[in-house]
Curated annotation (Swiss-Prot):
Family: Belongs to the class-I aminoacyl-tRNA synthetase family. MetG type 1 subfamily.
Binding site for Zn(2+): C141, C144, C153, C156
Protein name as annotated: Methionine--tRNA ligase
The enzyme's E.C. designation: 6.1.1.10
Motif 'HIGH' region boundaries: 10-20
Organism, scientific name: Bacillus mycoides (strain KBAB4)
The gene coding this protein: metG
Cofactor: Zn(2+)
Database matches in InterPro entries: aa-tRNA-synth_I_CS, Anticodon_Met, Met-tRNA_ligase_1, Met-tRNA_synth, Methionyl/Leucyl_tRNA_Synth, MetRS_core, MetRS_Zn, Rossmann-like_a/b/a_fold
Keyword terms of this UniProt record: Aminoacyl-tRNA synthetase, ATP-binding, Cytoplasm, Ligase, Metal-binding, Nucleotide-binding, Protein biosynthesis, Zinc
Domain of life: Bacteria
Main location as per UniProt: cytoplasm
Motif 'KMSKS' region: positions: 329-333
Length: 544
């Protein structure tokens, strides 16, 4: 089976925060799971280095756009690597291969009659002497009357035209823009209304899109899909490949999402492999992002793919809701966020992955609190999983000199483990990651109970053969937990496999156990609960 996984592209205008990771982590869980099953996986993403936010940040800091893009792209790569993300290709939108691919897609859509020219009115700043791209205009949403950008309202998810905003202001200088005529290219989205409607119906029947993606897309379809501008007067970006229009740039509506396609082509260049299997209609595709990116993946990207004749339109849309911080809406401008480079300096990446999965905003907004984060680490990772692994392996080290005792696998335990691979695998494929991880930890708690009830410390004296059976079965459980938890907790899983001299990762019961164990070390360290107060004070102290 061919599995394509696309993770949304973060803007390279500032550090990643936990809200980004909460929405992107499911992509890595999927990639690790399907690879363990032996499927062909292509997992791609990259840094958006062309967006308006980067230009604005560069102007604010008095540096070049490239300096800003380079700084954060490199930081993103480090953060994703430290968190265990396993992208097959992580690239950037200011690269030559991305520009070439986007231009080819633009020309193909133009040739097929899906892109046309149109004279329109656009916001123009007399002070800055330039036409203002959508994100350069800020004001009040005409639908919900909350603060909004010129392209989209985060409060009500309405797609906007900058001229629709009330109380319009130029983001750069704060002055009120005028309105002037200019010519732009438009994407004929209305031509794809029926095909996208059919795709939504299929997703609804099969449950392959998150509810928020279905509801929002149905809303847009009910209103009727509106043609969208796909060119803008921007200082950076992909130039329009049409004579006389080279000064205009291909707009984010099709440029950013085409990054999935350009990353795939870049992967081909790097590896010499063929990517066509991932764009075939039989391919299983997953697009992983936050709910603010839904229309790009449920409407724009399917329309682009249909327009260029590719059949692998998004089959699974994994659109998480928002993550709040200490019960407050995350705000980068006010510095109310938990920044990824910062948390990685002090905490285990598996602790971060665990919390953001069991507390994932899969169907509703969820909250990150330092209290819950630290208590979940101490009680679940250290107290349940780490405790079971450590008490078993230390027992072997102490009483058997590191040699795993011989035994036979308990039939009840074997059935339980085989059932785990099936139920956890199904939950992952259905993008129910929280359910999948909770199912494994239910089994971890069962394993601790098994150890306690068997009382091997007593069996060793009273019934040595039964003690060997107990410990053998505990090692059997540990070996399988290391496989089952690999998509979620890759670092601790690798450490367990190394201790058991089991290198291979595959999604099937591990029935062959090691003869010896080596170098038993605790999987997790206890976090001092005093850290809670320290972290909360630090968070409040950094607020602007």
């Amino acid at each position: 089976m061919s599995i394509f996984i696309g993770g949304a592209w973060p803007y390279a205008n500032g550090s990643l925060h936990l809200g980004h990771i909460a929405s992107l982590l499911p992509g890595d869980i999927l990639a690790r799971y399907y690879r363990a099953k032996g499927e062909h996986v292509l997992y791609v993403s990259g840094s958006d280095c062309n967006g308006t936010p980067i230009t604005i940040r560069a102007k604010q800091e008095g540096v070049t756009v490239k300096e800003i893009a380079d700084k954060y792209h490199e930081e993103f790569e480090r953060c994703f690597r430290s968190l265990g993300f396993t992208y097959d290709c992580y690239t950037r939108t200011d690269s030559e291969h991305h520009h070439e691919t986007v231009q080819k897609v633009f020309l193909r859509l133009l040739e097929e009659g899906y892109i046309y020219k149109k004279v329109v009115e656009q916001a123009y700043c007399e002070t800055c002497t330039q036409f203002l791209p959508d994100r350069y205009v800020e004001g009040i949403c005409p639908h919900c009357h909350e603060a909004a950008r010129g392209d989209q309202c985060d409060a009500c998810s309405a797609i906007l035209d900058p001229l629709d905003l009330l109380e319009k202001k130029c983001k750069l200088c704060g002055s009120t823009p005028s309105v002037q005529e200019t010519e732009h290219f438009y994407f004929a989205l209305h031509k794809f209304q029926q095909q996208i409607k059919e795709a939504v119906e299929i997703a609804k029947q099969k449950g392959t899109w998150r509810d928020n993606a279905i509801q929002l897309t149905e809303r847009y379809l009910k209103e009727g899909l509106q043609d969208r501008a796909v060119s803008r007067d921007l200082p950076i970006g992909v130039p329009i490949p049409v004579a006389g229009y080279e000064d205009k740039k291909i707009y984010v509506w099709i440029e950013a999402v085409t990054g999935y396609y350009s990353a795939s082509k870049h992967w081909v260049e790097e590896t010499g492999k063929d990517d066509q299997e991932f764009w075939d209609k039989e391919a299983k595709t997953y697009y992983v992002h936050g709910k603010d990116n839904i229309p790009f993946h449920s409407i724009i990207w399917p329309a682009v793919l249909l327009g260029i004749g590719e059949e692998a339109i998004p089959r699974h849309i994994v659109s998480n809701e928002y993550l709040t911080v200490e019960k407050r809406k995350l705000s980068t401008s006010k510095n109310w966020a938990v920044w990824v480079p910062d948390i990685l300096e002090r905490y285990n990446p598996d602790s971060i992955r665990y919390f953001l999965t069991v507390n994932a905003p899969e169907n509703r907004d969820t909250d990150f609190s330092w209290r819950e984060f630290i208590y979940s680490h101490n009680s679940e990772l250290l107290g349940a999983y780490g405790n079971f692994v450590n008490r078993t392996l230390k027992f072997i080290e102490k009483y058997y000199g590191g040699t795993v005792p011989k035994g036979s696998i308990d039939v009840e335990l074997k059935d339980k483990v085989e059932g785990l691979y099936k139920s956890v695998g199904e939950a992952i494929e259905q993008t129910k990651f929280k359910v999948a991880l909770e199912t494994i930890f239910d089994a971890v708690r069962f394993a601790n109970k098994y150890f306690d009830e068997k009382q091997p410390w007593k069996q060793r004296e009273d019934d040595p053969v039964s003690c060997e059976e107990t410990i053998y079965n505990c090692v059997y459980l540990i070996a399988n937990f290391a496989q089952l938890l690999e998509p979620f907790l890759p670092f601790s899983s690798e450490r367990v496999r190394n201790t058991l001299s089991s290198v291979k990762v595959n999604w099937e019961p591990q029935n062959t156990l090691p003869n010896r164990i080596d170098n038993v070390q605790p999987l997790f360290e206890r976090i001092d609960v005093k850290q809670i107060e320290h972290e909360v004070e630090k968070l409040y102290g950094a607020v602007k």
